[in-house]
Amino acid sequence: HICGYAHTNAGTGAKSEIGDAAYGGSVENDNSGTLRYIRLEYTGYAFSEEKEANGVSFYGVGNGTTVEYLQAYKGSDDGFEFFGGSVNVKYLVATDCSDDSFDWTEGWNGYGQFLVAYQGDKATIGYDCDCLIEADNNGKNAAATPVSAPVLANMTLVGNSSTANKRGIRL
């Protein structure tokens, strides 16, 4: 996971789900580096409902960070999860992730463009995804500010036959 110094609505002393790394602050243009042209295969693990390792977890990452051309492939939890921050992302692909393809919480308000989520059939991938998108503000305080409000454009979401009577997007 990547921990930055941009905003989060989780309060001071926010800690990552894995490793208890500190994150968050008030540096909206926080630069946590460049991630470009990366394929993450078979990553992640759900230790418990509150302790999950995703394909990539962005904790309070700012908009000075470059995130482009990433694929989360057959991960054991979410493909990409955003915990607050203002990071902008382009060209992300989540393929056959066991939980959500894209997930955000704690006030993420970045931009996402050219995003693709694809879920194969349960018989093929061995599990059933929860949602293509799961979006919330703060699990402990729905009115926490800043409110999650990302701007998304040019998305393609492809479910499968085993999710026909489930939620593709959970807001």
Specify the residue positions occupied by each region the protein language model found.
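Beta-strand/loop edge motif enriched in small/polar residues
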Residues: 1-171
